[in-house]
């Protein structure tokens, strides 16, 4: 099957009809307005414009808002600005909108943070002090992340995307798991996605545990149950790209890893597929032929419930993935299926069946633009083109609440404001 996908003659390929999945995002609008010499294309635009472009021009099923520095720690001084941006975006958008950032525990070490750098301490053979520094940093990471998301959730965010969990090793994952646990305890309706930084959790500390399981050395199929136990709705497994090997080799390895993670996970899996992970080549402008083949293989062979679109230019990442395997958001029913995955932890098949039943259509109709265009207009649940008088933003989402039998956080905020 994988060989067939790789050898298809077309430049772009796509999943078979009916196998489409919802997409989530890393890096938010930075791929549009960012210009740091990586994958951002430097278009001067507001984040509202960036988010709405993903919703209405790219056909994204979900989107996220993120700070230009894209880590939780730098958000603290400007959290009020982030909250205002979130409120404005939620008033104008229909698809689920997350707040995304990296836990990035490295920012808590000198010279950027208050704790001694474990790397420097380990070079001096001060192993116990290095471990102590990691433990303190993890505590601060948990505290800061929870505090930031308390503010953002109060401003209408649908949820949070923890991007590159474990980037600083097992301490980073430890702090993130406890942040997820705290947020789930406080906010039962918050959508929580936890995407990993790498395929294996690096044992920088080596002895940290969560729920009795040592974090160091965990692989994707072992990470998934812990992320679910902490309280996440969706897990984002990773398989690293080996830049010394071919795309075919990397994709075969990635599909093998992710298929095992999907099988072991009690919650939906949105495989991370930015440049350098998930069988995607390490290039700022990811080749479209490689991206669409990887996208198709992850859906049809690994059986993922969704794809987390990562770093890469707009053409090479969101547009290519959505064309290959996405549900095209409010062009069809992608946002509705995504909401069921996040609000009820439904796997892709169950989510599609639930939404199709609520709409009174066949599952194949969920990605039929003609059927869904008429149905969305009739039900007033938000349409991709601008029609005077049609429900938009909060109004459309209130109708979605009634249709799906769920509560949407931005609608709850609006109801409180007019009470």
Swiss-Prot record:
Its EC number is 2.1.1.249. Keywords: Methanogenesis, Methyltransferase, Pyrrolysine, Transferase. GO terms for biological process: methanogenesis; methylation. The keyword Transferase applies. Pfam families: Dimeth_Pyl. Pathway: One-carbon metabolism; methanogenesis from dimethylamine. It catalyses: Co(I)-[dimethylamine-specific corrinoid protein] + dimethylamine + H(+) = methyl-Co(III)-[dimethylamine-specific corrinoid protein] + methylamine. GO terms for molecular function: dimethylamine methyltransferase activity. InterPro entries: Dimeth_MeTrfase_MtbB. Catalyzes the transfer of a methyl group from dimethylamine to the corrinoid cofactor of MtbC. No evidence for expression of this protein has been found after growth under presumably inducing conditions. Belongs to the dimethylamine methyltransferase family. This is Dimethylamine methyltransferase MtbB3.
